[in-house]
Amino acid sequence: MNILHSTLSTWRDRLAPVSRTSTFRTTGQITPEEFVLAGDYLVYKFPTWAWADASSPAKRVSYLPPGKQFLVTRGVPCHRRLNENFAGDAGHEDEIVRDMLSGADADDGDGWLRTGGGRDLAEKQAERIKDVRTVDESGNMGEREDDEEDIPDMEDDDDDEEAIIREPAGKSTTQPIRTYNLYITYSNFYRTPRLYLSGYLSPSEPLPPHLMMEDIVGDYKDKTVTLEDFPWFDGGLKMASVHPCRHASVMKTLLDRADAALKIRRDKLKQAHSAAEANRINSERGLEGLVDETRGLSLNEQQGHAAGGDEWEVLQHDEEDQVAIRVDQYLVVFLKFIASVTPGIEHDFTMGV
């Protein structure tokens, strides 16, 4: 079934009509030219990412230039699996992430999942009780007290080494570090980026595809993540892929909220009565701060400083029509969203954070 789905998906992308009209602001979709523009920006800002070509000319798509068929970053660490121990809270109730711009009646589709958000406070308190230590009259903290049954017997020091039952290999609670190669491609059918993941247990030992699902948030793993052949490689290399069917709607929501947050900030700046108040407002990063430190690059804001320090940022008339996130910054925001799908993979490692 996966082979059939992968083949149909590849041919659907290659045969779909190519859009040359930008609908970035209205639909969250981008054209192939905008994908290249956003890829160039990602590579420029974060050199761990690079453009790559298909393994052979036959694997190339015509709507992207040779040498820029997809983006790749290699060796991204993944330290922990998404089980009940992940982040201390995984395995418990997930929650939908929203922001203050969403109303009380907002649909779950307006946000995205964050794993392990609903752990009961009483559970945490019960765990803390186990970490009680003693304090002497001088205020010095003592060592953790072992349970009575855990106090060692002095005779144990003479145990025969050969009689000790050791933990079998592979049963250690310390989880081995996995690494991932991440690939961003362009889906011509959905007109959005698409992420593929290829995992490794060691530099020379690929991670079996079904084990990659251990690093995907459960709700996505069950609905939108599939195992497919990577269309740009010969030989049928199987990877996990986040299906792009909802990428455009999620990106549109994020872009709209970033614009709304920027408008609120500008309105506050207009009403500011002092330089100190304006500086405080400027330091508050709303959703337009999704693009890391690129906000200053996108707004082209000018600042005036009088001799007495009474003037602050001046908003030019044409800046009212500017947006919080440009189309060339699209992939940076896209990766912030993807990080919620695979929270165990250190996406910030790829972005020099």
UniProtKB/Swiss-Prot annotation:
This is Autophagy-related protein 3. Keywords: Autophagy, Cytoplasm, Protein transport, Transport, Ubl conjugation pathway. The active site is at C245. The gene is atg3. Residues 249-329 are annotated as: Handle region. Residues 85-167 are annotated as: Flexible region. The keyword Cytoplasm applies. The N-terminal region is involved in phosphatidylethanolamine-binding and is required for atg8-PE conjugation. The flexible region (FR) is required for atg7-binding. It comes from Neosartorya fischeri (strain ATCC 1020 / DSM 3700 / CBS 544.65 / FGSC A1164 / JCM 1740 / NRRL 181 / WB 181) (Aspergillus fischerianus). GO terms for cellular component: cytosol; mitochondrion; phagophore; phagophore assembly site. It is found in: Cytoplasm. InterPro entries: Atg3/Atg10. One of its GO terms (biological process) is autophagosome assembly. Residues 144-156 have a biased composition (Acidic residues). One of its GO terms (molecular function) is Atg8-family ligase activity. Monomer. Interacts with atg8 through an intermediate thioester bond through the C-terminal Gly of atg8. Also interacts with the 40 amino acid C-terminal region of the E1-like atg7 enzyme. Also interacts with the atg12-atg5 conjugate. Belongs to the ATG3 family. Residues 135-156 are annotated as: Disordered.
